[in-house]
Amino acid sequence: MPGTLVYVMGPSGSGKDSLIAYARRKLNAPYSLTWNASVYARQGLRPVAFARRHITRPADAGGERHYALTREEFQSRKRAGEFALSWESHGLYYGIGREMDSLLARGAVVVVNGSRQYLPEAMAKYPALAPVLISARPEVLRSRLEARGREKQADIDERLSGAAVRLHDIPGLVRLDNSGALEEAGRTFSDLFLRLRRMPTPQAG
């Protein structure tokens, strides 16, 4: 596929949602996978879209905007082949709509909030994906998880234990520390997409 899939990962509390929202505002990019690509073409830029995830979590649970599904709805859509990517984490199911593939085929930059554990499967399906790892110091992770008030203490401890997952020998991996002010990491994060959208749109062979 000639487009670029940017696969963003990081432990709970690293601030992935906040960074993605920051970059989306900076680029004035859509929070879904539909837009008028011809407008971007006239500007000489590659389209950038931030995928809105399907999650088995209530719509009013806080955090990112997502498509809320029951487990039964999720599994039905998965069986129907409606997801380009899907995984399970901390008792929840996550999916990215298959419309992502048509956008990549048109040369778009598609940004996905992914999972570190699912990275090998994602790389097998999209070998040219651009992986980005967001991190933060352990005490910052705990403080953020406690502040958002979504999890019980035992759940927070479980998420923090998973924060120690290490990624090694990942080609092209971009690492970004988000322990400080959002604007600090946000500028660096946004610059990545500004560079990608200015790149010539690859031509399909």
Go through the PLM ranges and name each one.
Residues 17:
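Walker A/P-loop
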Residues 25-50:
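Post-Walker A helix-loop "phosphate-sensing" segment adjacent to the P-loop in P-loop NTPases
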Residues 110-115, 124-148, 163, 176:
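Conserved phosphate-donor/acceptor-positioning beta-strand/loop module used by diverse small-molecule
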Residues 5-7:
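Short hydrophobic/aromatic beta-strand immediately N-terminal to the Walker A/P-loop
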Residues 14:
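ATP-binding Walker
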Residues 147-205:
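Small-molecule kinase domains that catalyze NTP-dependent phosphoryl transfer to phosphate-bearing small molecules
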Residues 9-11:
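P-loop (Walker A) phosphate-binding loop of NTP-binding proteins
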Residues 42-110, 116:
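ATP-dependent small-molecule kinase phosphotransfer cores
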